[in-house]
Swiss-Prot record:
This is Small ribosomal subunit protein eS1. GO terms for molecular function: structural constituent of ribosome. It comes from Lentinula edodes (Shiitake mushroom). The modification N-acetylalanine is found at residue 2. The lineage of its organism: Eukaryota, Fungi, Dikarya, Basidiomycota, Agaricomycotina. The keyword Heme does not apply. GO terms for cellular component: cytosolic small ribosomal subunit.
Length: 256
C-alpha cells in the first residue's frame, strides 16, 4: 500500500466561510482642531488604528496633511477658492492640533482669471519669516486697460513685465520677512500683498486680479509645543504657583 496523503480526508467541509471582521472596529475617531487664526476650530474628524503593541496611534496621526477650504474655516463663501493645508503636529487626548502647512487656489478659480487680450505675469520667491519658517510664495497678476485706452489688447512689453516681476519680488520679500507665520497667513485673506503689488506697478502698467496664489512651506523650525499651544489659544505655562500652607516647623528637643 502506497503511503501518502489521502486527499479525500484532508479536504475540509465545503460552504464554510471565514469570519469577516469589521476593520472599523479596530479604529478610533479623532477631532481635527484648526489654529485660532480661523473662525471655525473644529475642522472635521480622522480615523486611525488603535494603539497596539509598539504601534502608537499618535505617531500615525502626526504629520497628516488636511486640506480645507478657507470658506469653511472662516464661514465666508467668497473665500472658498482658497485651499488651506493643515498639518497635525500634536495629539492631546482625542484632539489633533494642527498648524498651517500651505495655501493654494482651486483650479476653477485660476482658469477663470486667464482671459484673452491680456498679459499674465507670474513670480515666485523664497522668504523666511521672523519665527524661522522658510516659505516659497507664488504671485500672479494680469494687465488691464488704461482709463483712456481705445485699443482692445492690453499686452505689456517684456521690459515692463521684468519691472513688474521685480516689484513682486521686493514686496513679497518685504511683507513676509517682517512678520511671523501667523501674521503672514492673516495677510493672505484680505489680499494685502496683492493690493501692494497692484499699487506699486500702477506707474509701469496697470494690473488687475493680483494674488498670492500659492504658499508652500519648504522648511519649518524645530517643533515647540508651547508655540503650538499659543497658536491654538491655550496656555502652556508649566511653572506652578506657590501655595501658602499653614505649616509650622516643630521645635528642636533638647533631650530625648
Amino acid at each position: 500500500m502506497a503511503v501518502g496523503k489521502n486527499k479525500r480526508l484532508s479536504k475540509g467541509k465545503k460552504g464554510i466561510k471565514k469570519k469577516v471582521v469589521d476593520p472599523f472596529s479596530r479604529k478610533d475617531w479623532y477631532d481635527i482642531k484648526a489654529p485660532s487664526i480661523f473662525d471655525v476650530r473644529n475642522v472635521g474628524k480622522t480615523l486611525v488604528n488603535r494603539s497596539q503593541g509598539l504601534k502608537n496611534a499618535n505617531d500615525s496621526l502626526k504629520g497628516r496633511i488636511i486640506e480645507v477650504s478657507l470658506g469653511d474655516l472662516n464661514k465666508e463663501e467668497e473665500q472658498s477658492f482658497r485651499k488651506i493645508k493643515l498639518r497635525v503636529d500634536e495629539v492631546q487626548g482625542k484632539n489633533c492640533l494642527t498648524n498651517f502647512h500651505g495655501m493654494d487656489f482651486t483650479s476653477d478659480k485660476l482658469r477663470s482669471l486667464v482671459r484673452k487680450w491680456q498679459t499674465l505675469i507670474e513670480a515666485h520667491v523664497d522668504v523666511k519669516t521672523t519665527d524661522g519658517y522658510l516659505l516659497r510664495l507664488f504671485a500672479i497678476g494680469f494687465t488691464k486697460r488704461r482709463p483712456t485706452q481705445v485699443r482692445k489688447t492690453t499686452y505689456a512689453q517684456s521690459s515692463q513685465v521684468r519691472e513688474i516681476r521685480k516689484k513682486m519680488f521686493e514686496i513679497m520679500t518685504r511683507e513676509a520677512t517682517n512678520c511671523d507665520l501667523k501674521e503672514l497667513v492673516q495677510k493672505f485673506v484680505p489680499e494685502a500683498i496683492g493690493r501692494e503689488i497692484e499699487k506699486a506697478s500702477r506707474s509701469i502698467y496697470p494690473l488687475q486680479n493680483v494674488y498670492v496664489r500659492k504658499a508652500k512651506i519648504l522648511k519649518a523650525p524645530k517643533f515647540d509645543v508651547s508655540k503650538l499651544m499659543e497658536l491654538h489659544g491655550e496656555s502652556t505655562d508649566e511653572t506652578g504657583t506657590k501655595i501658602a500652607k499653614d505649616f509650622k516647623e516643630p521645635e528642636v528637643l533638647e533631650s530625648v
